[in-house]
Swiss-Prot record:
The lineage of its organism: Bacteria, Pseudomonadati, Pseudomonadota, Gammaproteobacteria, Lysobacterales. This is Endonuclease V. Its cofactor is Mg(2+). GO terms for biological process: DNA repair. It holds the Pfam family Endonuclease_5. Belongs to the endonuclease V family. Its main location: cytoplasm. It comes from Xylella fastidiosa (strain 9a5c). NCBIfam families: PRK11617.1 (NF008629). DNA repair enzyme involved in the repair of deaminated bases. Selectively cleaves double-stranded DNA at the second phosphodiester bond 3' to a deoxyinosine leaving behind the intact lesion on the nicked DNA. Mg(2+) binds at residues 50, 118. The keyword Mitochondrion does not apply. GO terms for molecular function: deoxyribonuclease V activity; magnesium ion binding; RNA endonuclease activity, producing 5'-phosphomonoesters; single-stranded RNA binding. It is an enzyme of class 3 (hydrolase). Its EC number is 3.1.21.7.
């Protein structure tokens, strides 16, 4: 899949934390929280992305997977490695991880109708988490799937599978706390771009397959964390 120049994504950024936060606030105003037209018909391809680090953080490892939407069958897996662009700064995860994620995206042979990213969407201090930033620069519908709360408040969902409650930030809903597996902590689900709050929840639920994480980010997480290297060897023709 081709995308615009990765170097141009941060064009004009002076590298400062202050400017990065200002850019986040500006970009957040362009986020669309309505379902993309491709989601109104039945999407056929889903993608999942996650990031890990090597060499004591000096190398960023991004994993991308492509799968069928109908049966969650894994079609492609890819891992790319790039030099880490900046140290970890709370709230600026996308500036650290996005270059690697976009490189991983270019490895996909087909364009997904919906993307799941490990991290937050609009459930973020400036409404531009990694999933929102990724969706905006790629113009792809995107959902953020996070293991921990970053911002906002929510009532703990019930203990049954599928129970969910809204995440509120300053009185506005920015996501869902979802009990994706019994006896596990809830996931933090938030729309990234070109998808509604409701659809972000329902698509995540559709992609649950007995594990805490939905399949797109679960498979990407296994690769990014090196737990899923067998997956790569199982699909040699796609790498």
């Amino acid at each position: 899949m081709k995308i615009s120049s990765i170097d141009s994504i941060f064009a004009g950024w002076d590298g400062s934390i202050t400017e990065a936060r200002r850019l986040q606030s500006d970009m957040a105003e362009r986020i669309v929280l309505k379902d993309d037209l491709n989601l109104l018909s039945e999407p056929t391809l889903l993608a999942g992305f996650d990031v890990g680090f090597e060499d004591e953080g000096r190398t960023t490892r991004a994993a991308a997977v492509l799968m069928n939407a109908c049966d969650l069958k894994l079609l492609e897996t890819h891992v790319v490695r790039v030099p880490t662009s900046m140290p970890y700064v709370p709230g600026l995860l996308s500036f650290r991880e996005l270059p690697a994620l976009l490189q991983a995206l270019t490895q996909l042979s087909r364009i997904p109708a919906l993307v799941f990213v490990d991290g937050h969407g609009i459930a973020h201090p400036r409404r531009l988490g990694i999933a929102a930033h990724f969706g905006l620069v790629t113009n792809l519908p995107c959902i953020g799937v996070a293991k921990k709360r970053l911002v906002g408040d929510f009532v703990e969902p019930g203990t049954a599978f599928g129970e969910h409650t809204p995440i509120l930030l300053h009185g506005t809903q920015v996501g869902w706390a979802l009990r994706s597996k019994i006896r596990c902590k809830p996931l933090m689900i938030s729309p990234g771009h070109k998808i509604s709050l409701h659809s972000a929840l329902t698509w995540t639920q559709r992609c649950l397959n007995g594990y805490r994480l939905p399949e797109p980010t679960r498979q990407a997480d296994r690769l990014a964390s090196r737990r899923g290297q067998k997956i790569v060897s199982d699909l040699p023709s796609l790498l």
